Amino acid sequence: MRNLPGGGTLAGMETAFTELIGCRVPVQLAPMGGMCTPELAAAVANGGGAAMLSLPLTTPAEVAATLDEVDRLTAGPVGVSFLVPFLDRECLAVAAARSPLLDFFYGDPDPELVAAGHAHGALVSWQVGSAAEARAAVAAGCDVVVAQGTEAGGRHRGGLPLATQKG
């Protein structure tokens, strides 16, 4: 796992998320495909947050090159997000061995994918769009559940705003 520059958290900002991920503020950059460049991810990580890269339809060599660039720009926590329908297991292995956090989206929570991430030492999160999907992510062994309602914009799985979801 990466060490965060400056160490510690901001006073009063300690949460289970900051402790688990190793960031200073409980903010995670959404893994917006094409928008989350190594430079943006590094800016978020260097500012104390957790950053995510979306790397769909890439090769293992491209994943490694992107993570090399991230390593050059930050020592902060930068994870990699995968769209389940386009998942390449070799890319997953490269990312899991080099990133503190893997994120999955657009697929039902899958215990095998969670176990694959954990086997390489990564934490695993799953983006969900309903309370039922959140329960499935917990049952699959995810370390983090990212609840996303329709107000998130972009692609989402849920059909309701997050505030209307009941547990």
Say what each PLM segment does.
Residues 7-167:
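Active-site entrance/lid segments in N-terminal catalytic domains of soluble metabolic enzymes
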